[in-house]
Structure formats: C-alpha cells, structure tokens
Amino acid sequence: MQVKLKVLLIGSGGRESAIAFYLRKSVLLSELKVFPGNGGFPDQELLPPDSFQVLDKNSVQSFLKQNPFDLIVVGPEDPLVAGFADWAAELNIPVFGPDSFCAQVEGSKDFAKSLMTEAKIPTAEYKTFSEYSDSLKYLESKSIPIVIKADGLAAGKGVTVATSKEMAQTALKEIFKDKKFGSSGNQVVIEEFMEGQEASIFAISDGDSYFLLPAAQDHKRAFDGDQGPNTGGMGAYCPAPVISESILQKVKEQIFDPMFDLFRKKGHPYRGLLYAGLMISPNGEPKVVEFNCRFGDPETQCVLAMLDGDLLELLYRASTGKIKGVQAAVKKGAAVVVVLAAQGYPDFYEKNIPLNLPETSGQNVHLFHAGTLKKDGKVFSSGGRILGIVAQGADLKSSVDQAYSFLEKIQAPKTFYRKDIGYRAL
C-alpha cells in the first residue's frame, strides 16, 4: 500500500496505548491524534479535551467536517453502540469498528443471545427478564451455580457467577431494585453456568472476509488463584494453549462463520473487530460466553505484541473492505500483560496515586498507560486499572519473569497486581 494516513484513535485505556504504540511503527502513518487519551500519550498527539463529545452525533460530525481523517480507530464499546461508525460513514470516513446495529452484540446481552440462537451458535441456555418478580420465580427452579447478567453495558462488571441462591437473589435485587447499572439493568439475562477454561479470540473483518488473531487467556478475578470480584481484567497471556488447532477450526466453523453470515443476511456486514469470549469445555467443545464489538482490554496489549506486521495496514484494509487473502503474521514465543491496579479496585479505589515509572527502552518490556493523567510533568493514577506491563519472549515463562521483574521496579503506593498471571499454561 502506498498511502499516507492521518489517523484518529478514540479511547483512553491500556488498549488504546497499545494500539497507538503499534500504529506509530507503521510506514503508512502520517499523523496520529488521540481523544481523550491518558497520561502516557505525548502532548502533540492529544486533541484538546473539549474537541467534541464522543457520544453526541452533531458534536462528532461538526468536528470531523473541520478536521478530516483518513481512518478512525474506535477503542471502547460505548461510542460504537451509540453509533459513532454510522456518523463517520455519513461523512465517508472509514472507521475501524462496527455500525450501531452490529455493536448491539455487546450493547445488549439479550440481542447477542437471540442472534446466537438464530445462527445456532453454541452458548449457555438462558432466559431474559424485565420484571424482578419473574426473575426470582425462575431462579427458584434452577440449580446453582448460575450466572446473572445485566443486559446492557456495565464496563465488564455486570456479571455475577452466583454460587448460592442468596448470592443470585442479591445480584438480581442490585440490578432491578437498587439500579446498580442504571438503564443497563432494565433487563437481566439468567444463564446456565458453564464448566471449563475461558479464552478470548479476536476476528478482524471487512464485512466480507475475516482473519483471526492469536488466542489469549484473560484473568478476570481481582486476586491470585482466581479469587475475589470480577474486574475488567487483571492480566492476560497469548497464545492460549487451551485453543488447539482442532478447537480453532470449530471456533471458525461453529462461531465466527455463522455470526458473520447472519450479520450479512441482516443487511449489516460486520466491519471491525469481533471478540468472542469463549468457554472451552473439558472435552474440547467451544461455547460463547459473550461477544464484544471491539478489542478486549487487557488482552489486546499482549495479542498485538505477538503480531508481526503492519497493524495500521490491517485496520485500514478491514475498514475499506480489502482484507481478502490477508493473514496476520504471528511471532514465535509468547507475550504476557500484567495489570497494576489501585487498591480497592474494582469497587471504591484510591485515585491520584503518584507514579514513579522506570525506563523500558532496550528491554522486551512495554509499559502501557491506562488510568493515568499528567499534572505538571508528573504522572498520577486516575482510574482503577493504572498500567499494563507487557513482555514478549521466547516462551511464556521468560515473558512472565520479565514482566514481574519490571513491575517490582515501579514505585506506586496503594496499588496491587496479581502474581499468578499465566499460571494455567506454566
């Protein structure tokens, strides 16, 4: 490809820091702008904080008319569910990310489950409720453990794996009565508990063709040994050995092929990234836990470390309908990301923690900012997940060792991290 591209990246997390890091390496990049960004981005890449409102169509379109871009890469799910890709398409600007119809696959658990039923995609049995009393009645007839999910977006925290009836009842009360997730809890999906190992697989699609990135395994629970509350993710590694070649074939044939076919049939070819969160049963059968309409975080940070090629070219081709025949070259070895989080995360957590960060240059380690901000040249925490430390090496053990030895050099009071990331594959 002989084009030079001015790119706008939307988002502020570790995922966006990683995407930006690999976009900068592209020979196709003429200029990168980021909105709203975080404390790790160079000032010249950041748009002013009042540039536009990312969930407001008029605001977005008026900004884009005055500031044209060749490609927009949308990191988080909220703008996609709101219609960001549709708004940019009206101005003929390519977007890496699906339209608002397709983005409902993450925006509504009920929508996703109904699509899976229609496409005969393997997933847990479920029922959707809009009335508290009906959900409680249904719960009585079910065995434990059972999974309670708020229907709408809840930043990865709307799911409870209930190990007792009381826990399930509390989860339903919090969603329906206490409005813990606001309108995202107007409906609740109750589904059967699935046994097995989880894995994440990302597919990049141009609406017609698609290819898969290497599988990763995320660690959702806050504490070592998979204890504690669910979080947005405390670390991940890639590739995930639980996904063998034969399982990968099943994932393509039973999950991605029928899903992309169904979107085309509905008149909405899926352009962008479709993330399948999978449960692999003990006998090697993949089932879908959830779909997301964007790169996962933190998995993206280690998956992109394994890509051997031009990320910008891949994203631009996907956004302009030109990925037929393209394959993502993958490095040998393994990569890991470990998340440094604020004490108290995922509930009420410390903020404004001063961060003293060592240099990473000359090492196979990258430090990706997430919940950080810059004040007077110094970096402070601003979110629950503060940093992602990524290492890529000859094998998982060497990558894990590098990541943890770097983490020990970071001076940040009132923070914590899991010390067992990758344990299932070590």
Curated annotation (Swiss-Prot):
It catalyses: 5-phospho-beta-D-ribosylamine + glycine + ATP = N(1)-(5-phospho-beta-D-ribosyl)glycinamide + ADP + phosphate + H(+). ATP binds at residues 139-200. SUPFAM superfamilies: Glutathione synthetase ATP-binding domain-like, PreATP-grasp domain, Rudiment single hybrid motif. It is an enzyme of class 6 (ligase). Pathway: Purine metabolism; IMP biosynthesis via de novo pathway; N(1)-(5-phospho-D-ribosyl)glycinamide from 5-phospho-alpha-D-ribose 1-diphosphate: step 2/2. GO terms for molecular function: ATP binding; metal ion binding; phosphoribosylamine-glycine ligase activity. The keyword Hydrolase does not apply. Belongs to the GARS family. This is Phosphoribosylamine--glycine ligase. It comes from Leptospira interrogans serogroup Icterohaemorrhagiae serovar Lai (strain 56601). The lineage of its organism: Bacteria, Pseudomonadati, Spirochaetota, Spirochaetia, Leptospirales. The gene is purD.
